[in-house]
Amino acid sequence: MIKIICVGKIKETYFKDALKEYEKRLSKYTKLEIIELPDYSYDEKKEIVEEGKNILNKINEKDFVVTLEINGKNLSSEKLSDFINKNISRNITFVIGGSNGLSSSVLDRSDYRLSFSKLTFPHQLFRVILLEQIYRSFKIINNEAYHK
């Protein structure tokens, strides 16, 4: 099973449509759960702490937690597919923080810190990118045409 915990709601229809498409495609390979948590507009420190508490409340004790962060490890699509294949039995939980990042308590709970790039992406777009890469990983794992 793959779970994605993310702060913030998807607002744009075209992002919602893309996410629905990848959710449909992924249903062939794995159970997928997406948990959207509210983003807060407090001062930055309080916001990170509150979002962190909400994130941790959605993580199960046995989940293999992957935080997505700019200073995490970069993987190729092939290496990400190896990583997912190796850890899928452990219920992989990907965590996308709010605009101010992740709390230290969430980072402490992380089993693996992953970065897709040193670039900064809008959270709505990044969620689509993440689902596409997870889908690509399953295509690679199953030796199916898609990845080049």
Which role does the model predict for each range below?
Residues 1-26:
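N-terminal beta1-alpha1 ligand-phosphate binding loop
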Residues 8-13, 39-42, 71, 120:
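Short histidine/acidic/glycine/proline-rich micro-motifs that form metal-
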Residues 15-19, 45-49, 77-81, 107, ...:
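Conserved strand-to-helix beginnings and helix N-cap segments that scaffold or border functional pockets
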Residues 21-23, 82-85, 111-113:
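Glycine-rich, phosphate-binding/catalytic loops in enzymes
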Residues 30-31, 36-93:
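S-adenosyl-L-methionine/SAH cofactor-binding core of RNA-modifying enzymes
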Residues 97:
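Rossmann-fold NAD(P)-binding glycine/threonine-rich loop
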Residues 101-105:
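Short, glycine/polar-rich helix-capping loops at beta-to-alpha or helix-loop-helix junctions
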Residues 106-148:
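Structured adenosyl-cofactor binding patch, chiefly the S-adenosyl-L-methionine
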